[in-house]
Amino acid sequence: MHQVKGLHEYDKKPLTWMLDSIFSIRKLRFPMLHYQTIPVTAFEQNCSVLWCDQTQEAAVVDPGGDLDRITGFIQRKGLQLKQILLTHAHIDHAGGTATLAKEQAIPIIGPHEGDQFWIDGLPEQSQRFGFPPAGHFTPNRWLHDGDTVQVGNCLLSVRHCPGHTPGHVVFYSPEIQRAFVGDV
């Protein structure tokens, strides 16, 4: 193959240049949702930290407990915690919600209002299962089937999935084909 003088390095490797361009455009134009699953409580239920790579804004899904582990991860990643998302109000998923919301001054989003009686019973649930005392809270926003929730520049669709609890919801990200399902 002949060398042509004056060509840019990428002209010698068109496939590399094309791939670099595609990935650079992807980073500039389209936000990507990232997540880390953190098992919490004696039940080791899946709490997830979600964040947008463009804004570094984060949400915590189902902070059932072990708040130091959750906030430690968020701090290490340099994320800005903006909200709590709840799939349902059982103690292992919602036990740390009131404390985290108060400490971080962030809103609580979800679940569906069908779980109001579970929220009201969180203090009793924590005693029954030997969890740290759970505070009572009122969500800033109840969720319904077809709603969307924003994490930074990323959107999650909401599906109401009663069964495990009357107000259980699921959060779905079509861009990463991942659902955050609680106990469904």
Model-derived regions: residue spans:
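Metallo-beta-lactamase
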Residues: 124-125, 148, 154-184
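Tryptophan (W) side chains
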Residues: 17-18
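Divalent metal-coordination and catalytic microenvironments
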Residues: 50, 62, 88, 100, ...
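Active-site HxH/HxHxD metal-binding segment of metal-dependent hydrolases
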Residues: 6, 65-149
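Conserved beta-strand hairpin/beta-sheet module of binuclear metal-dependent hydrolase folds
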Residues: 31-77, 170-184
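Short hydrophobic alpha-helical segments enriched in small aliphatic residues
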Residues: 3, 9-11
